[in-house]
Amino acid sequence: MNTHPLTLEYLKKVAMRPGMFMRDFDLRALELQLYGFEAGLSAAGVMGDFENFNRSFSDFLLSTTELSCSQGWATAILSKHGQSEHSFGVFLSLLERTTFQGGNS
């Protein structure tokens, strides 16, 4: 079940053209964009009951990698992989593994 349909559609666009959405593959900027995106969905009255992607992804990341997400999922990934295109690839790889994306966690 895809519990984050609108957010995942947004992330598909980011994955196809990351330079249009963030500078230098900045995961922190992406995480903040997602907070804003979901605030917009909520204000428009179109956010689903389970649309809180950042919280769900942080929970997934903690359970599968044991990385602390106390400062957000982006900081957790960056603490292990550094700020680079590689860390963006790690994020996309983890995203593919999530149950709300349809993967096997």
State where each predicted segment sits.
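Amphipathic alpha-helical segments within well-ordered protein domains
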Residues: 15-18, 58, 62, 75-78
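Alpha-helix boundary/N-cap detector
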Residues: 2-5, 28, 48, 52, ...
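Short terminal alpha-helical segments
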Residues: 1-38
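Amphipathic alpha-helical interaction modules
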Residues: 23-66
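Amphipathic alpha-helical binding modules
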Residues: 2, 13, 68-105
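Conserved aromatic-histidine-acidic binding/catalytic patches
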Residues: 2, 18-25, 45, 49, ...
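Short, flexible helical or helix-coil boundary motifs
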Residues: 18, 37, 41, 68, ...
